Regions:
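Hydrophobic alpha-helical bundle segments that form small-molecule/ligand-binding pockets
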Residues: 119-121, 125, 131-162, 202-206
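Helix-turn-helix
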Residues: 2, 13, 17-55, 59
Length: 206
């Protein structure tokens, strides 16, 4: 019997269906049978698209970062305004996504990061690649802000390179998002925004 050729649309459909399930209950909390039932794909066909649940989890993360980095590019490079304004727009979008009603906009890194890094090296590597893609984009926007004069960092930050500042900001927002999830309170995210403006040398009305 001939093998069934993988169909990209079906593969993407499985990933799309799995995303909200994983956001809700995590990787280990969602069974393969549940994903297949939601996607209406038979178990036998699943293995034409993913060799294992681990490979499936890696593919979910890669699909998430592809979409997320595209949105990040739109906010940090394609949006109008100065580089400083684009940076604040990016973090405004982050804050809105973590406090709004759309559960599917939540950060998959916050949900899965600590859980899967000890379970799967391939998923940990996918997370590392994706998060590096984010901090690289933030660093480029910080460099653009220094070039266009819209970012004037305070004295304590002037010696830091753009990549170091980008990583510090990303760490701050990841931690704030996790704390907001634990406390069900946005105070940590509002504090992250204040800290971001301070680190970048921006006034509250930028």
């Amino acid at each position: 019997m001939n093998a069934i050729a993988p169909t990209p649309d079906v593969r993407q459909h499985i990933l799309d269906v799995a995303h909200p399930l994983l956001l809700q209950r995590g990787f280990t909390g969602v069974g393969l049978a549940e994903v297949l039932a939601a996607a209406k794909v038979p178990k036998g066909s699943f293995y034409h698209y993913f060799g294992s649940k681990e490979a499936f989890g890696e593919a979910v993360l890669e699909a998430y970062f592809t979409e997320y980095l595209g949105r990040t590019d739109a906010l940090l490079t394609e949006a109008p305004g100065t580089a400083a304004q684009r940076l604040i727009g990016y973090f405004d979008d982050w804050l809105d996504s973590q406090t709004g009603d759309d559960a599917q906009s939540r950060c998959l890194v916050v949900k899965l990061g600590a859980e899967v890094c000890d379970l799967s090296e391939s998923m940990r590597a996918a997370l590392a690649r994706g998060t590096r893609g984010i901090t690289d984009r933030l660093a480029r926007c910080i460099e653009a802000g220094r070039a266009d004069g819209s970012l004037q960092p305070p004295p304590q930050a002037k010696e830091q390179d753009a990549q170091g500042i980008a990583v510090a900001l990303y760490q701050r927002w990841l931690g704030a998002s996790l704390l907001a999830k634990i406390t069900r309170d946005r105070a940590s995210l509002d504090m992250a925004m204040r800290d971001t403006r301070q680190l970048l040398g921006l006034s509250p009305d930028t």
